[in-house]
């Protein structure tokens, strides 16, 4: 089983999605930073000149679809986008702006089908935001809200519209202006009947005199900025095309976007030159490392040696902000008070790959910069290839980390040639050498429907990357090593675990976590979690379960002995 095969499958799947999309979805079709008509439709598309840099956000940018009170031309669309501050939003987050004009003089059923087709083109939508104004809001309330598209849309804003009768599926919404209280009722009724979710909210402003700008600013602040949606149920979301899926999933998962100001998180962007910048012969453009620091307010002035550090690693080819913004650890840091650092470990866009020694060196720099960090409580977590990095670090840098976790990633079989030297043979050899001398807490998380690094079953368990890494950590921790699997013993794991339970996450009855642990001397050294029906990506509720595992482990900074409490 080779790393390249799995990752190239994912890459070619994404390429296939893009190739199948319409050309206007790929590149601006008019002057930069202006609106232009999309060929063969009444829709106007804002042609964003991409200017996002290392200081912007990871992505999941909103795709704004504006249903105006009356048909707008290009200049009117630009004026409206300016009023609502949409251009600045998509410059920070990425995304797009489209004005969905009616296809004739009045809104009609055909406009609904046009919209369905519009958001169904290209890859799976993740952050559809609908803005209805006046008659456009009436159309949204009476027609769009009555369809299953509400399970795909991440937020609806209705301003000065007439009310509809039903909202088919729960959708976050902001209702303002005329008729707001009455218009909100179908949205509220559907929301109230849904399982409790802080992201599933309906906010109402009944001030008839409030300006459009004021109402939308409130909508962005209280509803739209806080979430996005994807469908990672039964498949990996970025390998899907459009809004349709053979499994018939209607209600896409709502996921939080960390809003740093509200969380009390300070984010620092660090470019670190790999030469002495005071040397007279330094190069003009030296090689650099890149990382991101996330510091909760309670950690800013904390006493020396009191703040844990969680180091995150993104997946193969991902943006170096992806893991921090999509894993759930930033939200947890705000609650629990630990610091988070995400590293551009892989190297991209002119930044150097770190390697395992570089990662250790960066942590040393960060500890010198922030004396409040507790060197005995340093942890690592990653996604996919970042999970492999984290899994490697727990063995190769066992003196540094108290515990590590991998989400959607194990260790591939073989000698590691061809993929960052991540092979099970050399890592197992090191684990064997350290067995009886070194202990490391280890947590593994994977979805049963991971179609990039497939989870194990009765047909593929031999040499499976997840079983490889579980055995490696059993070995280094001096525990019995799992042999052949028997899915009659446990239909999920294939062997017996303690504390075995099924956790209901509140997200969906289809998304539950199979949970179990392996003990040594009454200490749970290995925590395994398998997410039923989930694809190859982060599942935010798992972050708390990982942190609850991490927090019990520390490593003596002098003797390097692992401690559990």
Where in the sequence are the language-model features?
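The feature captures the conserved acid-bearing segment of alpha/beta-hydrolase catalytic domains
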Residues: 149-199, 403, 409-522, 536
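Bacterial N-terminal signal peptides
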Residues: 9-17
């Amino acid at each position: 089983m080779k790393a390249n095969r799995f990752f190239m499958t994912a890459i070619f799947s994404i390429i296939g999605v893009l190739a199948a999309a319409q050309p206007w979805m790929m590149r601006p079709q008019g002057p930069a930073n202006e609106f232009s008509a999309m060929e063969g439709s009444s829709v106007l598309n804002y042609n964003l000149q991409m200017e996002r840099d290392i200081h912007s956000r990871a992505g999941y940018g909103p795709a704004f679809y504006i249903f105006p009170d009356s048909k707008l031309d290009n200049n009117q669309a630009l004026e409206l986008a300016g009023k609502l501050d949409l251009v600045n939003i998509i410059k920070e987050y990425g995304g797009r702006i489209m004005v969905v004009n009616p296809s004739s003089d009045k809104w009609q059923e055909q406009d609904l089908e046009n919209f369905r087709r519009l958001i169904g083109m290209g890859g799976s939508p993740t952050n559809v935001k609908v803005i209805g104004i006046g008659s456009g809001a009436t159309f949204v309330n009476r027609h769009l809200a009555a369809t299953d598209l509400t399970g795909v849309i991440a937020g609806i804003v209705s301003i000065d519209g007439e009310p509809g009768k039903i909202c088919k599926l729960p959708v976050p919404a902001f209702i303002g202006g005329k008729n707001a209280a009455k218009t909100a009722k179908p949205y509220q009724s559907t929301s109230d009947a849904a399982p409790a979710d802080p992201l599933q909210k309906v906010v109402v402003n009944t001030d008839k005199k409030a300006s459009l700008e004021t109402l939308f600013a409130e909508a962005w602040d209280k509803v739209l900025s806080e979430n996005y949606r994807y469908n990672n149920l039964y498949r990996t979301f970025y390998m899907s095309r459009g809004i349709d899926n053979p499994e018939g999933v209607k209600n896409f998962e709502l996921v939080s976007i960390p809003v740093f100001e509200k969380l009390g998180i300070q984010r620092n962007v660090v470019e670190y030159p790999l030469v002495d910048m005071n040397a007279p012969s330094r190069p003009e453009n030296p090689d650099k490392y890149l990382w991101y620091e996330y510091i909760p307010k309670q950690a800013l002035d904390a006493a020396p040696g009191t703040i844990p550090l969680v180091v995150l690693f993104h997946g193969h080819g991902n943006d170096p902000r992806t893991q921090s913004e999509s894993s759930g650890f930033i939200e947890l840091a705000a609650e629990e008070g630990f610091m988070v650092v995400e590293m551009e470990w892989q190297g991209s866009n002119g930044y150097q790959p770190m390697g395992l020694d570089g990662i250790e060196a960066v942590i040393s720099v960060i500890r010198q910069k922030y004396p409040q960090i507790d060197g005995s409580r340093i942890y690592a977590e990653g996604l996919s290839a970042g999970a492999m990095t984290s899994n490697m670090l727990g063995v190769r840098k066992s003196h540094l980390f108290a515990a590590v976790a991998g989400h959607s990633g194990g260790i591939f079989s073989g000698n590691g040639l061809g993929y960052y030297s991540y092979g099970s043979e050399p890592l197992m050899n090191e684990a064997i050498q350290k067995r009886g001398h070194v202990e490391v807490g280890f947590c593994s998380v994977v979805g049963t429907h991971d179609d990039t690094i497939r989870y194990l079953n009765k047909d593929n368990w031999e040499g499976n990357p997840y079983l490889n890494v579980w055995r490696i950590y059993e070995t280094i921790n001096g525990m019995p090593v799992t042999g052949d699997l028997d899915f009659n013993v446990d239909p999920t794991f294939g062997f017996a675990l303690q504390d075995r339970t099924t956790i209901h996450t509140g997200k969906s009855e289809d998304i539950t976590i199979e949970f179990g642990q392996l003990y040594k001397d009454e200490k749970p050294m290995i925590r395994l979690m398998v997410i039923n029906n989930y694809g190859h990506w982060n599942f935010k509720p798992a972050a708390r379960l990982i942190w609850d595992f991490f927090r019990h482990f520390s490593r003596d900074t002098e003797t390097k002995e692992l401690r559990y409490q």
